[in-house]
Amino acid sequence: MKHLLTLTTLLLAAGHAFAQPPDSGLANLEGASGTPLPMQVKAITQTVRIESDFIQLPLLQRADARKPGAERFEIRADGKVLRYVHLQFAGKDQKPDFIYSYDVREFRGREVTLCFKSSDAGVLARLELNNKEISDPQAYEGPHRPRFHFSPRLGWMNDINGSYYQNGLYHIFYQANPTCAGASCGFDMHWGHSVSKDLVHWKEWPIALFPNAYDQCYSGSTVMQQQPITGLNEGVMLPAPVLAFTATGPHGQHLATSPDGGRTWQRFAGNPVVPRIGDADRDPKVFWHEATKSYVMILYVGGKGYVFLRSTDLQKWKRTCERPYWYECPEFFPMKSPTTGEDLWVLYGNYNPPKEVPGKIRASSAYQLGRFDGTTFTPVTEVRRAHLGPNFYAALTFVNEPKGRPVMMGWTRGTRFPGEPFNQCASLPLQLSLKAFNGQDTLCFEPVQEVNALRGRPLVQLVNVSPASVIEKCKTLEKETPLDVTLSLRPNEKQIVKIVVRGLQFTYSTATGKLTCSNNGRQISETEIHPDGPVAARFMIDRGIVEAFWNGGEAAFSISSLHTDNGPTFAIEGNTTIEDLQIFSMNNIWDK
């Protein structure tokens, strides 16, 4: 371990000069939000040559790292801010809540200036550089961490970004603030990055995109580059991934590529490729359209909804059509209609028409089917609700999925994990399909087959039993045990069946076909399902999150639910026969 001051001595002996920490603070430093930081916050600088992989940052967990007292860490060179993040260092006599290994491998062999805008003049002396990434072995063992849903080891996550598959690995990126631990921190946006060989066991890779200057790295997607383009993936075997994302310095849509199979990423020198065109441009969805040999971008631009753009080189873009009322995080992919056999496209995202527009749904997960010729999307259906949430948002499908499946992961927005060193998690990977229900093509969500490999021992196996038998058998289920529950039931005519999972209640009426979901007595969603025979349902019960799938995914839910909440782990009420009930424990994806 090398303290920075020790490193200073070593480099001075080699002939390198260092700037000394100033005695006075700067008069009007600004945080990323533009809010002046308090006068007592000082700028402490030290120029070093980076010869290690990580700077070890001893940090305190904060509710909001940009409020007064926040500290700003910067890496500067050549008069530019190359990196920054807001945080709070542990004081001289304070025990840090956690150590964050801040990755500086990008700057190895380079002389940079470390700048700390801090109220603690001695902070530099307590920082260490080394080549070891410190990882708390107990970080994945917290009582509220999900056992089979992905969550970051440390810090905040939100939108899923840029999911793709290549060379045996599934990649997911996500909006991340890795230094705020379990606080709610939707700022200082990085792109976190994790990989998996099987869609269920995940390993964190280095941060893919860091904010620089007063920049933010907001949401986006991955496109597979198909042909040589000057400045993009030169010397890399094609097709190769290109990240498309929103950045704020300068504001616009930016690109990044990887020289080493996705482990590290470099911003394109010609950014931004799409300057600001609306009042809130963000979240580019970019894909290759084979029929027209062109790239297509769908971009949220504020009041005008989604805008479609077209390019042949990922750099020069032409606007082709608009879809009003859509909001944030667009997704777009082809699927075959089960009713007509026609190849259609699915436009997916948040649909948010103004209240004065009558007859329109409003949904944080919505879809519309239509035809697409490479320039114009022509709807053939109305906009419909898709996933019913309420904790499901900003979802993307995997590009280049090896089995040709549309597989989607979303952010389970609003989930709670008290006391943990992280905040928020991802949904299970869900296979999408179009199925015919009630004469129309319906977008359905179901866990991918790979999730079944996480099943442990069977805990309950019942055939042709009553609800009372289920309640009796399930009394012994431990609340902290993650579960996979599948059931098939046949309600009597014009009956109401209730299924209780912790504090959640699903109520199905055979008379109306209506399915409602309530959380601790408050209704949070209602829909209709159209079973042809027994009613099938599946419940994936994890710590902090429950996902439910009815009638082959016709209705899908993702709901925040602590295992310490009141209510039985699983129970059924009503006049019905449970034809089959299988309950398995679920293995911990974080076990070595």
Describe the predicted segments one by one.
Residues A32, V41-P58, D64-A77, T113-F116, ...:
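Beta-rich accessory regions
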